[in-house]
Amino acid sequence: MPQERSKPLKSETSAADGPPDYRLVGRHGMFPRTSHDEIERFNFLAHMNRHLASQVLPGVQAAFEARVEPAQLRREGPFRTRHAVRKALLAEPAFQVWSALRRATMEQRQQAGRWVTLRQGEALNARADELTDGDDRLQLDPGMRTPRYLTAVDHHCMPGSYHGEVIPGDVTGAANYDCGLFATTGGALGRFNDGGGRAVAAWVKEQLPDFKPRRILDLGCGLGHNLLPLALAFPTAEVIGVDAGAPMLRYGLARAKAMGVDNVRFVQADAEDLSRFADESVDWVQ
């Protein structure tokens, strides 16, 4: 029987100020398995990102108010556009420090996530295929042309962005996104990274208590972090997620099924063209 640890004296403790331990992250049947060292990498990044957001970024605002904005007012008058603000901040040391560190943690976060997912890629892909094979709630379009604004850059520094595939039927990019977002946000979105969707659902229920949507359309749904809370909050509605990235959609349906959420559909499409949906056929678009 393990020995009970003695409780520290109150004078020796202080309230925790930081993200929760990665071991508390919400896990489901599609979630990648993590080793001790992989967990601690995510813990370091979560704490670093929380520190940058809570301690370093406010210093950028202070520098803007104390140096950048007064210099602009003396030189040309008020800033006219956000682009002008950004250009001025690029020369500010406080912004340079924050920006360099934030970029570094994002690159490290992608390295950490890919170490986790690529080593078990075959197992993840097989698990997703087993859960989604023959399910008409996954509607992929191999002939869809991915818009250039998605192919021109690796969004969030993720190699291949959200649409890239290492092998046919790949879900490793989506799994990387799912297991690493907790570290990116410092746990701010909750155990399942679904805080945004839960907040929207709660607000709608409070503000529109009689609203009973039959169909909800989520554009740019990714793997469904914000889609599933809507499906759970409105169980009689069909919640349809649209995204350009096939890996995200494969993983999204597999994740939904692993979590026991059935009233969902994942559709690969360019959100610029929604002609497949008839006019007035949905009650809620987001």
Segment roles from a protein language model:
Residues 1-92:
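Generic N-terminal amphipathic/basic segments
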Residues 79-169:
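N-terminal auxiliary segments of SAM/dcSAM-dependent transferases
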Residues 176, 190-212:
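Conserved alpha-helix/loop element of class I SAM-dependent methyltransferases that forms part
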Residues 181, 185-191:
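Solvent-exposed beta-strand/loop surfaces, strongest in extracytoplasmic domains of secreted
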Residues 211, 262, 280:
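Structured loop/turn residues at beta-strand edges in well-structured enzyme cores
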Residues 272-285:
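A short acidic, Gly/Pro-enriched loop at the edge of an enzyme's catalytic core
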